[in-house]
Amino acid sequence: MILEIRLSNFFSIKDEVVLDMQAASIQTKKAKELEENTFVCGDERLLKTVAIYGANASGKSSVIKAIRACVGMIFSSHNYNENTIFAFTPFKFGGIGKPSTFLIRFLLEGIEYEYSFELNKVEILKEALYYYPNGRRSLVFSRDETKGPDKKNIYEFRSVIRRPMDVAANTSKKTLFVSRASQMDRDTAKDVFRYFNERFILNYFGYNSFSVERLLNENKEQFLNVLRIADSDIVKIDSRHENKVFSTAVIDPADNQILSVEDIQKPQLVITTYHRNNPDVPFNFFAEESDGTQRLFNMMLTILDIVKNNKILLIDEIETQLHIKLVEYIIGLFNKSESAQLIYTTHNTYLLNTNKLRKDQIYFVNKRDDGSSDLYSLFDYKDFRDGLDAEKAYLQGRFDAIPYIDEQTDNFIK
């Protein structure tokens, strides 16, 4: 689970910003009432959800995009070649040519890890992994490409990873050592890689048909509840697999000519829905339900899987195409989960409610005079007491992070 993320020189982020998922020590009645929004992992109490507010073009999305870019590199950098250009943009007003940095602290099997790397658009410059097996910081490996070209000077290892120099010899400046070491079956690196690959959900995604059927059957009542919140009149939903006959051509590889056409059977998922007004009339879900209902279905598959399996979801503009009550329900699912974590951006001030979110769960992004983004928490405002109206204070500009609107519209209208 995430303890902390630090970023610098990504997109509109210039100076280092910190997203802290460790619950602050808030000794108030309201914080105690919202204790279910936190969970204990090891010796740490962590937040389940964090909301990021800010004006348009303030840089809210930059936080999500930067995390996605860095985690995506961990997933796939072992496949990069010498022509790869990394999928991010440094801060354009002074950040071009300077390194970008990413650091994450997380808990894996109750042990704290600290992983970081530094890079520019075309190569990895530094990388390091530490862990705390007995509560004390211990090096797994460090890498500094400025000390090259000799790999023995670039890398420093402890005795955690098996034959590490074999991995280093196969790690180019385009590749993260963790990615390569995992690919080469090194245990500690595999554990770290698996953490990012299995725990971090960077966006909504698809499932195979058997997983869809399983998730639907396991969560049918919750699906129907979500549909009710979305003002759907669906009252029943069933699923099954049917064998469908498909025709397939047999091709002669020698001349690419069709030799024959064969019928084959494949299992196909069939989802049937029933509506309030005519509960005996079946509807083919994929053919007859609306695009919006199908999008909601796919999204909720992801969310229910994440919540049940204690994964981590990043969402930019969580309210997009969703009713605000449904968004509130989704956030509530995470806050009621065992240890799932949700990081999301939003414009909707209806959700800015300190009766439902702790002060350390609310972050703001504000654009500085130089165009860069600053990230800070409502918890930083020590004079903001429980019981005050956070939405009203935000709209009045008390926390900045709102757009400047010139109310003199006469010239614009003319």
Regions found by a protein language model. Give the residues of each.
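Conserved ABC ATPase signature
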Residues: 49-53, 253-304, 312, 318-322
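C-terminal lobe/lid and adjacent interdomain/linker elements of RecA-like ASCE P-loop ATPase modules
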Residues: 4, 329-414
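Electropositive, glycine-dotted interaction segments
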Residues: 114-246
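Pre-Walker A-like glycine/lysine-rich segment at the N-terminus of P-loop NTPase domains
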Residues: 2-69
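Conserved catalytic network of the ASCE P-loop NTPase/AAA+ motor domain
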Residues: 96-97, 108-110, 304-307, 334-338, ...
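Short alpha-helix of the ABC ATPase nucleotide-binding domain corresponding to the H-loop/switch region
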Residues: 323-328
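Conserved P-loop NTP-binding catalytic core
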Residues: 35-51, 55, 64-124
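Conserved Walker B
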Residues: 10, 317-322, 349
